Curated annotation (Swiss-Prot):
Biological processes, Gene Ontology terms: negative regulation of DNA-templated transcription
Pfam family, one: Zn_ribbon_NrdR
UniProt key word Signal: no
Cofactor: Zn(2+)
GO molecular function terms noted in the UniProt entry: ATP binding; DNA binding; zinc ion binding
UniProt feature coiled coil, ranges: none
Residue intervals of every unnamed zinc finger in the record: 3-34
Cited function: Negatively regulates transcription of bacterial ribonucleotide reductase nrd genes and operons by binding to NrdR-boxes.
Name assigned to this protein: Transcriptional repressor NrdR
Cofactor info, note text: Binds 1 zinc ion.
Residue ranges occupied by any ATP-cone domain in the UniProt entry: 49-139
Family from the record: Belongs to the NrdR family.
Keywords: ATP-binding, DNA-binding, Metal-binding, Nucleotide-binding, Repressor, Transcription, Transcription regulation, Zinc, Zinc-finger
Length: 149
């Protein structure tokens, strides 16, 4: 690590501790030439996740899109913003833990529906109607009947 004061490349770590909810390490360093101290942060580099859409195009994973879809599905329902954000965070964590670099949008949609089904069935049906592109009332009824089993 190059000293920001004299550009010398040698330093020693004086103090080290977790920072940013344990997602980074904060280090206090001391330059071995000028003896000035400075702070550095060490963080694991995020691996970009690509979502494979239905038309086979790819786009970067965006947790905000999940949150936006959930907000629409849960509008005027007893589902809190915290619950919505927790679902999105759980899905992102699930994908990251599986070390997936590419994931089909269908898989994400199914994970969302699985979580919504346990929280609020009306929100689940709303989300499913858009996600599965229900064409008529019969498709709606089939989904509702499957919920009632």
């Amino acid at each position: 690590m190059r000293c920001p004061y004299c550009s010398y490349e040698e330093s020693k770590v004086v103090d080290s501790r977790s920072a940013e909810d344990y997602n980074a390490i904060r280090r206090r360093r001391e330059c071995l030439r000028c003896s000035k101290r400075y702070t550095t942060y060490e963080k694991v580099e995020d691996i970009p996740i690509l979502v494979i859409k239905k038309d086979l195009s790819r786009e970067s994973f965006n947790k905000e899109k999940i949150i936006s879809g959930l907000i629409k599905a849960c509008q005027k329902r007893p589902v809190s913003r915290a619950q919505i954000e927790e679902i999105a965070a759980d899905i992102e964590r699930n994908i990251s833990n599986k070390m997936m670099v590419e994931i089909k949008s269908d898989y994400i949609g199914e994970m969302i529906m699985e979580r919504l089904k346990d929280i609020d069935e009306v929100s689940y049906v709303r989300f499913a109607s858009v996600y599965r592109q229900f064409k008529d009332i019969n498709t709606f009824m089939e989904e509702i009947k499957s919920l009632m089993k």
